[in-house]
Amino acid sequence: MPAVMIQGTGSDVGKSLLVAGLCRAARRRGLSVAPFKPQNMSNNAAVTADGGEIGRAQALQARASGLEPLTDMNPVLLKPESDHGSQVIVQGRRVGTLRARDWFERKPALMAPVLESFARLTAAHDLVIVEGAGSPAEVNLRRGDIANMGFARTAGVPVVLAGDIDRGGVIAQLVGTQAVIDPEDAAMIAGFLVNKFRGDVRLFDEGYRLIEARTGWRGYGVVPFFPEAALLPAEDALDLGRPTGQGALTVAWLAFSRVANFDDLDPLKQEPGLTVRMVRPGQPIPAEADLVILPGTKSTRGDLAFLRAQGWDVDLRAHHRRGGRVLGICGGYQMLGRSVADPEGLEGAPGVTEGLGLLDVETVMHPDKRLTRVAGRHRASGAELTGYEIHIGATEGPDCARPFAEIEGRPEGATSADGRVVGSYLHGMFGADGFRRAFLESLGAATSDLAYDARVETVLDALADHLETHVDVAGLLALAR
């Protein structure tokens, strides 16, 4: 099968970025290439062209490949709902919620849909670049594995192991992985990469040779730190944790415990007229905030309780009294209303949770999940909007008579009577340049000529150039068989 797999010595070593860059490099070689991640765990999901959902990292990799995202690119997606359980998405569709112990019993059965999706991709493309999850060194998770060596051995896909030198101990990461995994698993590893190097790469020559000597693996390169990665859609909410920009207008966003689809904020953090700040648990909402954003969440009622535990409900009311603006997106929109009812217990115990009361609307959860890409117009400015909806529940009430947008002929969202509180189910709205400028101008912010989608394309090309300079890309892609 024409595939090669990038696994890592741990989480956050840069696997997703490496795969995106390799996909773009392969595409520029004239290859039909597709990304594939057997299993992902993320509340940051993308709606696919075939009406399902996958991890947003795979959607970015699809973009790097010149493809529309498809459910086959990430056949198993786990969306954490609590510390002990996750919603399970198989080939784009919700199949239920499992506690961690139940997941480990059920996951071996998911190898069949994983292989089915993989087979469709390999049949349709010259090359498939596979991304692992976490680390194969977590040998306590090896039984029934579908994400790393369990998949690689079953599908016969060679592996390149990536280590992260930025966090230190990369020699131990790589050599140690070989030491703890089964010999049959180790035999699948054809080589290694050292990622996120800072400084003079020549200073690591001895360490690089030592890894080759200790493991017998071929080194495919040392990849210097790529700072432009900050301009790509964030894969982890922590990527947005550092305040960005020094603009006159301050946007604060609330870091819920189950925050989802937080890459809605990416275009804002690149606007020079804004200062974008994450409000972490235990911190107050800054008094200087002009706009407070309540982002999406995987657990609306749970994160409403979390919000109140931080005192953010009090802060939000004070912010509103001072004349501040509030925007709720998806789950954040649901929180802004008078109540959130979950009669079937879709997010926990059945019941009704009192909302923040900043919008005169009510939400009722129901099991039918809305997964769709949409286009329309912002009601206030007339600017074109594009984005996607990914939610359960329906929201109704008097403030819906003042919709945020017109989406494909229907009103969407709600606006308070004073016009300072807005809610919408539309993710990705700030990627639409015209709307973003109009919205920010309505807040009094200085806007720029940022063309967000074009910038993402430029950065993906720069990432491919970066890998071509520092990695034996031709040799690595030649491993595919």
Swiss-Prot record:
Q: Where is the active site?
A: C330, H427
What InterPro entries does the entry give? Class_I_gatase-like (IPR029062), CobQ/CobB/MinD/ParA_Nub-bd_dom (IPR002586), CobQ_GATase1 (IPR033949), CobQ_N (IPR047045), CobQ_synth (IPR004459), GATase_3 (IPR011698), P-loop_NTPase (IPR027417)
Keywords in alphabetical order: Cobalamin biosynthesis, Glutamine amidotransferase
Domain of life per record = Bacteria
Associated pathway: Cofactor biosynthesis; adenosylcobalamin biosynthesis
Does this UniProt record's set of keywords contain Zinc? no
A single Gene Ontology biological process assigned to it is: cobalamin biosynthetic process
Residue ranges annotated for the GATase cobBQ-type domain, each copy included = 248-435
Listed Gene3D superfamilies: 3.40.50.880, P-loop containing nucleotide triphosphate hydrolases
Q: Does the keyword Cell inner membrane apply?
A: no
**Could you tell me one molecular function GO term of this UniProt entry?**
catalytic activity
- Its signal peptide is none
Family recorded in the similarity comment: Belongs to the CobB/CobQ family. CobQ subfamily.
State the protein's purpose: Catalyzes amidations at positions B, D, E, and G on adenosylcobyrinic A,C-diamide. NH(2) groups are provided by glutamine, and one molecule of ATP is hydrogenolyzed for each amidation.
- Record-linked PANTHER family: COBYRIC ACID SYNTHASE, DETHIOBIOTIN SYNTHETASE
What is the recorded name of this protein? Cobyric acid synthase
